Amino acid sequence: MSTQKQRGSGHPFRFADGGKRYHTYDYWLKSTFGGKCAKIPLDAGFSCPNLDGTCGHGGCIYCSGRGSGDFAEEATVPLREQYDRQREILAEKWPTERCIPYFQARTNTYAPVAVLRPLFEEALTWPGVVGLSIATRADCLPDDTVALLSELSEKTVLTVELGLQTAHDETAAAINRGHTYADFVEGYARLRSAAPKALICVHLILGLPGEDEAAMLETVRRVAELRPDQVKLHLLHVLRGTALAELYEAGGYLPMEKDEYVAAVVKALELLPPETVVARVTGDGAAEDLLAPLWSRRKREVLNGIDMALAALDTWQGRKYQPLVTNETNR
């Protein structure tokens, strides 16, 4: 990692502005597209293999019926209409013409290519679109789907968002993920090899049942070895109507405290490659469904806490990153 100091930053982290000590998504958007972009959540009505019985039933224990698409329109609304509505709403917060359609809800490659192709290609024709983001699972990337993603990556800035959550198979089984870490790495490597222009964003959850800080950071270390283009760090939310809510209400799950979460995020950032974009350092649970932790509603406070902790420790993203000499999954 370079130790060249960014002008006025007071620390040697290069991929940031405004004094940030990690590679923010906002910085990447400005560097890539020349300014802010609105990411438009969409629900295309797909299912998941751990919902329909292919590798399990009921989905992940923390997942609502919307499959991480709680902020998208209902799937019954046509995709273009979803896009236009959400674009109008987000324009009040981020007045920008640049937009990235985000196929977010559930597993968005869990269908034949004949179904996927027209959906994704149509999205590229919508007004203001400068890129495309597709959320899926690494075990839902057959060869013909990867070939389609490679085609799309030649036409636009494509981000494929892969849910991993944990590198520990015991935890993955407990939360009903329906795949192992080896499954994830196999899918990741094939995507990296066959669609080299596609950006890969890996999703991780901190605070999963049975995991302490050491276990969480071991997941981050393993992911850092893969050198993904982007990472999202999520706080585990307890949402009404989920299996996790039942566990929580029965006293079988204790959510992270804010200070614990901030400390874990700081240590996670230190382990990640400095070039990796940190697309999220916390998440949003639908307010009406959030049971715990209630402190997570104060998102700005959490973000400020992370910035303050990094500054207090005089540390930054990648400070403790140790690259492997060789790794078949690297670019």
Label each region the model flagged.
Residues 68-77, 105-118, 132-195, 206-227, ...:
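Conserved non-cysteine loop/helix-boundary elements of the Radical SAM core domain that shape
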Residues 1-100:
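N-terminal [4Fe-4S]-dependent radical SAM core
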Residues 87-120:
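Long, charge-rich boundary regions
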Residues 27, 121, 147, 189, ...:
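Active-site phosphate/pyrophosphate- and oxyanion-stabilizing loops and adjacent acidic/basic residues
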Residues 38-42, 99-101, 132-134, 158-162, ...:
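Hydrophobic faces of well-ordered beta-strands that scaffold small-molecule active sites
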Residues 1-27, 36-38, 230, 238-331:
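Auxiliary Fe-S-binding modules of radical SAM enzymes
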Residues 117-122, 150, 211-229, 285-307:
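Short, electropositive alpha-helical surface patch
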